[in-house]
């Protein structure tokens, strides 16, 4: 069993990131771990289902706020990530990476590059996927 809270703690210690959450997408589609009182802590099942079922989604709601899809390879077994931008000012990069049981949401600060957010989120997802979760 993966300790999701340790991943969130690791991310929250880094000054490059504004928000992070881990959401189950197989069964309950609820938030498993998140930074409290932030946007991703408000993610609900109705926002998760379109992310995993609709490949052509352009402006998904995440935490009751609109985002704009930059690239979508979330359901691809080799890439398993989606890049987004916030649809409100200040514009921040967001990456969603898929493990076998959960989605890892990571939002960078407006000054953080998309590549940093992508690399960090994918690294966490790759480590979790290696354990079989």
Swiss-Prot record:
Key word rRNA processing present: no
SUPFAM superfamilies: Profilin (actin-binding protein)
GO MF assignments: actin binding
Keywords associated with the record: Actin-binding
Pfam families given in the database record: Profilin
Function: More likely to influence phosphoinositide metabolism than actin assembly.
Family assignment from sequence similarity: Belongs to the profilin family.
Name of the protein this chain belongs to: Profilin
Species whose genome carries this gene: Camelpox virus (strain CMS)
Lineage: Viruses, Varidnaviria, Bamfordvirae, Nucleocytoviricota, Pokkesviricetes
């Amino acid at each position: 069993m993966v300790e999701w809270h340790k991943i969130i703690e690791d991310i929250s210690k880094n000054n490059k990131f504004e928000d992070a959450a881990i959401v189950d997408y197989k069964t309950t589609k609820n938030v498993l771990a998140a930074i409290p009182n932030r946007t991703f802590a408000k993610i609900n099942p109705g926002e998760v289902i379109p992310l995993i079922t609709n490949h052509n989604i352009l402006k998904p709601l995440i935490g009751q706020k609109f985002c704009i899809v930059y690239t979508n390879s979330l359901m691809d077994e080799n890439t398993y990530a989606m890049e987004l931008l916030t649809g409100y000012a200040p514009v921040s990069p967001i990456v969603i990476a898929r493990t076998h049981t959960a989605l890892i949401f990571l939002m960078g600060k407006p000054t953080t590059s998309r590549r940093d957010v992508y690399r960090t989120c994918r690294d966490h997802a790759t480590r979790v996927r290696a354990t079989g979760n």
